[in-house]
Amino acid sequence: MSNIHEHKILILDFGSQYTQLIARRIREIGVYCELWAWDVSEEQIREFAPNGIILAGGPESVTAENSPRAPEYVFNAGVPVLGICYGMQTMSEQLGGKVIQGVGEGEFGYAQVEVQTESALFKAIEDAVSETGKPLLDVWMSHGDKVSAIPEGFVAVAKTETCPFAAMANEDKQFYGVQFHPEVTHTRQGKRMLEHFALEICGCPANWKPSSIIEDAIERLKEQIGDDEVILGLSGGVDSSVVAMLLHRAIGDKLTCVFVDNGLLRLNEAQQVMDMFGDHFGLNIVHVDAENRFLDAMAGEAEPEAKRKIIGRVFVEIFDEESKKCVNAKWLAQGTIYPDVIESAGSATGKAHCIKSHHNVGGLPDDMAMGLVEPLRELFKDEVRKIGLELGLPYDMLYRHPFPGPGLGVRVLGEVKKEYCDLLRLADAIFIEELHKADLYNKVSQAFTVFLPVRSVGVMGDGRKYDWVVSLRAVETIDFMTAHWAHLPYDFLGRVSNRIINEVDGISRVVYDISGKPPATIEWE
């Protein structure tokens, strides 16, 4: 088996919103990469031994005092370097060029760059041709500052009307800088540029693919675990499901999955999990029916964060109880993925912003004397899904819309009761079913129903009814950081509303949430 980690790219993060996207694009090309904070040490870079280094973008100004800089060793490591946006600016400034602060003439959004001279990075790519026969590229810009003088040994490769150095290169040292963002889809030839850098300039083979990742993960799991037993909290979500399948391939019956039914799942979800993993795939699953325990613990609590903490605490208690029954289990498996690792990493100097501390199963008891197994910790979510498909998990399960960890606990507004959860489950199932039937499910990023703790007067036949209200929510988004409400057809919404009111006894009114993010969040709680 080839070593899929032998050839790799190091990406240094200066705080750009696009940095993880760069890493995902490099992985899509078939090359392993890791994303580290910009203030990494020379020793760490030497130990990692990358075939190439990418300096990512960032929000700060190179002209500002104490702004982030690439480690000097980056330019002495003898490997190709690609600077993107801020990365190009700090490369230029650190190697003797000049950067000037933007004063009202930055470039944001679509731009067209004209390629001035041949470069390995731009080899045989163009979107159009200028009147003078020069290649033109459609790119995405997001910068205020700009390079005003390039370092000695560099040539200007591309320009725009307002940016004389939209790209630069030192072909002898294989140093390249681009002021635009090749990682975003708006830069039409961006993927080919990154392919040129990773595959041709850095010489990495394209061997990072699902089948190779699975083979590597199974070998490493066997080596790590040996003949020991492992326990896994299986939720039925993407991450824990893929972990379960990998471990089952690696160690078979030495894996015990604990599935906790908290009474806050979607319609028939608990049975679907048991049918798929227990009956179909033959995994060893302990099914804990804990609906009453969770609902009793949340009784009288209406505050969202308090509900989340209660749900988390009760889960930990139950998982601890079940793990003690698995007396031979030496390892705890978790579905930690690479973005979790990145967000927890922080920065040596404190300059890089640490978004949150992360632990996949938060608050597990300190006396749980087990080793940790995290087979997905190198992978992005899209990679986890592709691996799941390769392992035989169904597409609909891997690509369904996100579902919050606390489940219906945060989709029933206010106090959570069994009656409310049962009504919400039925209404939500109708909404999702109709989205599938209308071929709309995969055209929205997330869709769900929310139970509102208010009653409304309705008319059924000759009688009046005073029943509950639900809200439908559907959004379109790329990254879930911002979102637009989905403009679903009126006749579709009418059909869903009619079905819910007629088929779910206890709901008298259906509304549609037309709030964007911001100012609203996607979930109501």
Curated annotation (Swiss-Prot):
Active site: 85, 181, 183
Keyword field contains Manganese: no
SUPFAM superfamilies: Adenine nucleotide alpha hydrolases-like, Class I glutamine amidotransferase-like, GMP synthetase C-terminal dimerisation domain
Domain GMPS ATP-PPase: 208-400
Amino-acid positions noted as binding ATP in the UniProt annotation, renumbered to this chain: 235-241
CDD domains in the record: GATase1_GMP_Synthase, GMP_synthase_C
InterPro entries linked: Class_I_gatase-like, GATASE, GMP_synth_C, GMP_synth_GATase, GMP_synthase, GMPS_ATP_PPase_dom, NAD/GMP_synthase, Rossmann-like_a/b/a_fold
Pathway: Purine metabolism; GMP biosynthesis; GMP from XMP (L-Gln route): step 1/1
UniProt keyword annotations, A-Z: ATP-binding, Glutamine amidotransferase, GMP biosynthesis, Ligase, Nucleotide-binding, Purine biosynthesis
Pfam family, one: GMP_synt_C
Domain Glutamine amidotransferase type-1: 8-207
Entry GO CC: cytosol
UniProt GO MF annotations: ATP binding; GMP synthase activity
Enzyme Commission identifier(s): 6.3.5.2
Reaction it catalyzes: XMP + L-glutamine + ATP + H2O = GMP + L-glutamate + AMP + diphosphate + 2 H(+)
Function according to Swiss-Prot or TrEMBL: Catalyzes the synthesis of GMP from XMP.
Subunit details: Homodimer.
PANTHER family, sorted: GMP SYNTHASE [GLUTAMINE-HYDROLYZING], GMP SYNTHASE-RELATED
Name assigned to this protein: GMP synthase [glutamine-hydrolyzing]
Annotated organism of origin: Shewanella pealeana (strain ATCC 700345 / ANG-SQ1)
